[in-house]
């Protein structure tokens, strides 16, 4: 039914799993731009947006079993970039298995936004029973996190 559903990314910690889930979530609205603007007005909007992104990340991090207050600070590139690199490395290792591995990669688009090229309607999760498969966008929890 889902040929790639049995694939499991190895050597990823909850921080990377939560980050990937965040990118899946944010890709539906164009991705996340971490570049700081130069004007004061744009900087204020950027900081507000980054607070919301960090809050979403904390909620997702908690879903993976982490303590929200211990979630890595994504605004710091020295923390975020190695996490993205590790996710990419693990995805590349599955290049022979995944149909089009580039679609799964976190990439910067022409606007400078980091996103994953998987349509939200194709993102699913299974419930308690492995046969219960739901679209991520239909999840109430996913919608609450997205609304922040």
PLM features: residue spans?
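Intrinsically disordered, low-complexity protein-interaction/activation regions
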Residues: 1-148
């Amino acid at each position: 039914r889902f040929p790639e559903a049995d694939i499991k990314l190895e050597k990823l910690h909850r921080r990377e799993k939560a980050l990937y889930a965040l990118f899946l979530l944010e890709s539906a609205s164009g991705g996340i731009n971490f570049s700081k603007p130069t004007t004061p007005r744009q900087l204020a909007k950027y900081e507000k947006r980054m607070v919301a992104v960090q809050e979403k990340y904390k909620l997702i991090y908690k879903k993976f079993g982490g303590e929200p207050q211990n979630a890595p600070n994504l605004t710091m590139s020295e923390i975020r970039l190695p996490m993205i690199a590790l996710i990419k490395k693990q995805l590349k290792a599955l290049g022979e298995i995944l149909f089009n591995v580039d679609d799964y990669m976190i990439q910067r688009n022409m606007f400078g936004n980091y996103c994953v090229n998987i349509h939200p309607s194709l993102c699913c999760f299974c419930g308690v029973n492995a046969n219960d498969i739901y679209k991520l966008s239909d999840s109430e929890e996913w919608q609450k996190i997205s609304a922040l």
